[in-house]
Amino acid sequence: HEALQLMQHAEEDWQALLREWLNAILKTGPVAQTKWVEEISRLGREKQKQFLRYFNHLLEQAIHYRIMGEKLNIGEKERDFAERLNKIAGIEQQQAIIEELDRASYYIERNANGKMLFHALTIKLYHIIQDKIVFLVD
């Protein structure tokens, strides 16, 4: 029971952190983005990778929800988040974000500087969402 509570608590923390990040990217701008990057940089590599996996999971759910609609069996919070993600990003953008998150996770495993990585990721996500740009990588 305690492990389940810890998991739910961690998920709520991740969701709050993700909401903060997306708001910084889309609404509040550079000062909030820098503050958020400072915050995630303090978490350590494993937590950073967990956060990226969590965001990836939500993006995959959003894509499934877009395709399956009400038939998809997900929780109320996840459904709400999926609907919001689907409003701000199309499938191509969501897939591009998933690829960027996977790449970031890979770089974290290889000792990338957390601050630089999350600053760059923030800028990439801004352009993917706002400008509907998908980065093509070899």
Segments and roles (model prediction):
Residues 1-54, 58-138:
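Charged, glycine-rich active-site and insertion segments that engage polyanionic ligands
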